[in-house]
A protein has these predicted regions:
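Short, contiguous alpha-helical
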Residues: 1-28, 56, 71-110
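Acidic/histidine-rich alpha-helical segments that form the ligand environment
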Residues: 10, 30-68, 89
Length: 110
């Protein structure tokens, strides 16, 4: 859920700053932190649901002008329009949901 929270914040940065360079973070290292390793899975699922609910509500309110705002991704120094990032994020979310569903089935939690 941390990755999705970062994406939500990126949308907000693009609306409140002029082409901000987003903060890069090391996802693998975040995944090794104690909360990621030991917290009940339901906490992450609840966080993911809350972030997605907020993001969907937020995105529905954006104007065409706002959708053309952008941020700079530091990994490749690429400018990313918010309207492009919606598509990237949709793919990313579906990819993560498939992993989550597989884990839930594998662990017998679903």
């Amino acid at each position: 859920s941390d990755s999705h929270h970062h994406s939500y914040i990126r949308f907000k940065w693009a609306l409140t700053e002029d082409k901000p360079v987003i903060k890069y973070y090391y996802e693998q290292l975040w995944a090794e932190l104690p909360d990621a390793k030991t917290a009940p899975i339901q906490m992450s699922l609840n966080h993911l649901k809350a972030v997605h609910n907020k993001l969907v509500y937020f995105l529905k309110l954006l104007t065409e002008e706002q959708l053309n705002l952008s941020f700079i991704h530091p990994e490749h120094n690429n400018e990313v329009l918010l309207k492009q990032n919606i598509g990237i994020y949709a793919w990313h979310s579906n990819h993560h949901y498939a992993h989550i569903e597989n884990l839930l089935k594998r662990k017998g939690w679903l």
